[in-house]
Amino acid sequence: MSDREFSSNDDLSLPKATVQKIITEILPPSSGQTFSKDARDLLMECCVEFITLISSEANDISEKEAKKTIACEHVERALRDLGFGDYIPEVLAVAEEHKEQLKSREKKQSKMEQSGLTEEELLRQQQELFRSATEKYNAAPE
């Protein structure tokens, strides 16, 4: 591991609401199972430790390659080196899904930029369309 290990994970945490949402998705209320607060907190600590372990190993790998940026390949190798090779296919699938979502966001942003209108002008047009639709709705015979 790196010389720059964290002295304590006390200040590191994951959002409780996010962890609770994941737990709820895995254990739906219909299952009759519950997850105690202590169990949730322990799970959060384990997740932080896992992330710290993987990121530290990936950092070491990138440093050995004289890279300044940790890439997906470094994380993949860290998982393999630490004995978590079974996770790699799922991690790569999620990474690919994330890339696709980013591309979709970029396309949406560029469509707005390509319109040549400012956000203010687009908002004004939208309000005019709403006003027009409301007038048509109110004028329609009953």
Swiss-Prot record:
The keyword Transcription applies. It comes from the Eukaryota. Transmembrane segments: none annotated. GO terms for biological process: cellular response to heat; negative regulation of RNA polymerase II transcription preinitiation complex assembly; negative regulation of transcription by RNA polymerase III; positive regulation of transcription by RNA polymerase II; RNA polymerase II preinitiation complex assembly. GO terms for cellular component: negative cofactor 2 complex. Forms the NCT transcriptional regulatory complex with nctA and mot1. Belongs to the NC2 beta/DR1 family. Part of the NCT transcriptional regulatory complex that acts as a key regulator of ergosterol biosynthesis and the azole exporter cdr1B. The NCT complex binds the promoters of genes linked to azole susceptibility, and especially represses the expression of cdr1B transporter. InterPro entries: CBFA_NFYB_domain (IPR003958), Histone-fold (IPR009072), Ncb2 (IPR042225). One of its GO terms (molecular function) is core promoter sequence-specific DNA binding. The lineage of its organism: Eukaryota, Fungi, Dikarya, Ascomycota, Pezizomycotina. Disruption phenotype: Leads to a multidrug-resistance phenotype, including the azoles (itraconazole, voriconazole and posaconazole), as well as the salvage therapeutic amphotericin B and terbinafine, an agent used in the treatment of chronic and allergic disease. Also leads to transcriptional derepression of cdr1B and its over-production. Also results in a notable increase in the immunogenic properties of Aspergillus fumigatus, but does not result in loss of virulence. This is NCT transcriptional regulatory complex subunit B. The gene is nctB. It is found in: Nucleus. Keywords: DNA-binding, Nucleus, Transcription, Transcription regulation.
